[in-house]
UniProtKB/Swiss-Prot annotation:
Keywords: Cytoplasm, Hydrolase, Translation regulation. Its EC number is 3.1.1.29. This is Peptidyl-tRNA hydrolase ArfB. It is found in: Cytoplasm. Residues 102-137 are annotated as: Disordered. InterPro entries: Pep_chain_release_fac_I, Pep_chain_release_fac_I_sf. One of its GO terms (cellular component) is cytoplasm. It catalyses: an N-acyl-L-alpha-aminoacyl-tRNA + H2O = an N-acyl-L-amino acid + a tRNA + H(+). One of its GO terms (biological process) is rescue of stalled ribosome. Coiled coil: none annotated. It comes from Pseudomonas putida (Arthrobacter siderocapsulatus).
Length: 137
């Protein structure tokens, strides 16, 4: 059971884990041991609340297939257990991030000090430009 928050949990049956051989350098260990984890999570068929499903499917993430299946590949660590924990943590992190809503920006008005500084600067510039004109003797 993967716990996302106090009231959101994912049963282990909804998360499909397959173990494959990792890529890259590592010599004999990499060639013989299936330490990388391939996690598949079917978003539409999951028991997540609809709000989370909609937000996850709306993400423009290359890890989500056209069918709505999220694929995470974890091969950073040397052991299968560490890679499994990493894949599950990344899944939980993605679901939590999708559940967060951004606060709306409340527009603010310029302060009195900023208005006066702006007007003083304009007045100063005006006198500089006025001094560039023709001079009568």
């Amino acid at each position: 059971m993967l716990t996302i928050s106090n009231n959101v949990h994912l049963p282990d049956a909804e998360i499909e884990l397959t173990y494959i051989r990792a890529q890259g350098a590592g010599g004999q260990n990499v060639n013989k041991v299936s330490s990388a984890v391939h996690l598949r999570f079917d978003i539409p068929a999951s028991s997540l609340p609809e709000f989370y499903k909609e937000r996850l499917l709306a993400l423009r993430d290359s890890r989500i297939t056209g069918d709505g299946v999220l694929i995470i590949k974890a091969q950073q660590y040397r052991t299968q257990d560490q890679n499994r924990a990493d894949a599950l943590a990344r899944l939980a992190e993605l679901i939590i991030a999708a559940g967060k809503t951004e606060k709306k920006r409340r527009p603010t008005k310029p302060t009195l000090g900023s208005k006066t500084r702006r007007l003083e600067g304009k007045a100063r510039r005006s006198t500089v430009k006025a001094g560039r004109g023709k001079v009568d003797f």
